[in-house]
């Protein structure tokens, strides 16, 4: 009992003595301050330290959902049960709405600046096509809404902009979108979503780049001279359409993720992309696990400097929603003006690039899966970043790549959870958190 009491007092003292690294704070009611998080985590950290020598059941081990937030694909409502699976469960992603608005504004700014030359056939209609990743994915929904809202082509349905694919809309008669008008230098243009579809392949995999490449071929064969702008929910699909048609025809293409190939392509005519701060996300994904395993304040090395000097700035690099137990990295627009700063998408973020002391943060084993080993962003950007941060955080991570189609392809490889100290899960579908928590609850 004396040992446990001492551990409890030491952990509490450690939490209360941490010094914040400052920076801007968000005004959102969903966001909590570093001080509030420190106080809220004090008891949790103390309890973790007190039981450090005890055998931890799988259901009580640290868990981080990432990239795909547990939620209903039909309504977008968060799965609070999954987000509160245990006291050390968190989600790490990015601020989807903020990023969606940035992408829409990036496209609009480009059109305004180049309206006279962007109208390729001079018909006064600036037509764009839209590649939709997954109609049931919150991030895809947000990006579709962001583009339509900013360009004025969105139609409200039940209080929000409809994110339903329009199909082919060359005549402007689709019900889920509308024509918008834009005046530039005294001339009025019509902005029209000529076509949009979900890029799902025959096997059921969404966000499919090959499907997007095929789609642009079909669209251009029918109304290619009317396409003035290409927009995509991500860079994987965007680059497929850019390489298949847009590059040779000098049609600006806008994506999302700031993948290395897309950033490099900006110098060749790719219009722009959005960095979702993958370096921050990857760090947070493993950092919340590291902190929980060490029994320290969850904010350590995030909004509060750790002993190595690692520290992010809340409101600049990320925001935290205490209610949702979710960390959201903030996005940055990448255009011709700044793309040279983003050419290496796998470089660790300078603010959190310091090695932890292994005597204080001993080696632990983590099971982590990527929902689709073929996903361009996750495989070429996110995982390489994770592999760099796992070294800095003294974590031995087993990386599991899924097929992008079924949860069972992943869960079948989680047959030995007792061998691991923590878990990081990237679901195929946001509805399917129970497929994983049921395994951890056995």
Predicted segments, located by residue:
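Sec-dependent N-terminal signal peptides of Gram-positive bacterial secreted proteins and lipoproteins
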Residues: 3-24
């Amino acid at each position: 009992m004396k040992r446990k009491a001492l551990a409890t007092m030491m952990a509490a003292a450690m939490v209360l003595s941490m010094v914040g690294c400052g920076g801007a704070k968000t005004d959102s009611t969903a966001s909590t301050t570093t001080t509030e998080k420190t106080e809220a985590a004090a008891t949790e950290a103390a309890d973790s330290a007190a039981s450090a020598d005890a055998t931890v059941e799988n259901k009580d081990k640290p868990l981080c959902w990432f990239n795909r937030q547990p939620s209903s694909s039909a309504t977008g409502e968060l799965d609070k049960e999954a987000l509160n699976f245990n006291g050390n469960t968190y989600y790490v992603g990015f601020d989807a709405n903020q990023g969606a608005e940035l992408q829409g504004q990036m496209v609009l700014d480009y059109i305004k600046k180049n309206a006279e030359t962007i109208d390729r056939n001079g018909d006064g209609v600036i037509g764009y096509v839209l590649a939709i990743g997954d109609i049931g994915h919150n991030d895809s929904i947000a990006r579709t809404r962001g583009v339509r809202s900013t360009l004025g082509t969105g139609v409200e349905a039940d209080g929000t902009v409809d994110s339903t694919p329009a199909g082919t809309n060359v005549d402007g008669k689709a019900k889920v979108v509308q024509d918008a008008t834009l005046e530039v230098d005294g001339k009025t243009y019509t902005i029209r979503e000529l076509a949009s579809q979900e890029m799902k392949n025959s096997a059921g995999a969404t966000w499919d780049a090959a499907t997007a490449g095929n789609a642009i071929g079909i669209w251009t064969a029918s109304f290619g001279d009317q396409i003035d702008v290409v927009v995509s929910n991500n860079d994987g699909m965007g680059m497929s359409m850019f390489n298949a048609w847009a590059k040779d025809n000098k049609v600006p293409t806008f994506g999302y993720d700031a993948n290395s190939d897309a950033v490099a392509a900006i110098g060749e005519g790719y219009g722009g992309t959005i960095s979702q701060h993958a370096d921050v996300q990857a760090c947070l994904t493993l950092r919340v696990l590291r902190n929980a395993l060490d029994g320290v304040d969850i904010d350590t090395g995030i909004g509060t400097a750790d002993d190595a000097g690692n520290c992010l700035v809340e409101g600049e690099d990320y925001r935290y929603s205490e209610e949702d137990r979710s960390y959201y990295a903030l996005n940055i627009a990448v255009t011709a003006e700044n793309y040279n700063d983003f050419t290496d998408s796998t470089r660790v973020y300078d603010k959190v690039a310091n090695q932890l002391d292994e005597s204080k943060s001993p080696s632990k084993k983590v099971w982590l899966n990527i929902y689709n080993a073929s996903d361009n962003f996750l495989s070429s950007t996110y995982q390489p970043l994770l592999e760099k941060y796992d070294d800095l955080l003294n974590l031995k991570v087993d990386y599991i790549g899924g097929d992008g189609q079924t949860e069972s392809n992943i869960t079948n490889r989680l047959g030995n959870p007792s061998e691991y100290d923590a878990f990081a899960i990237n679901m195929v579908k946001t509805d399917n958190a129970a497929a994983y928590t049921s395994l951890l609850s056995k």
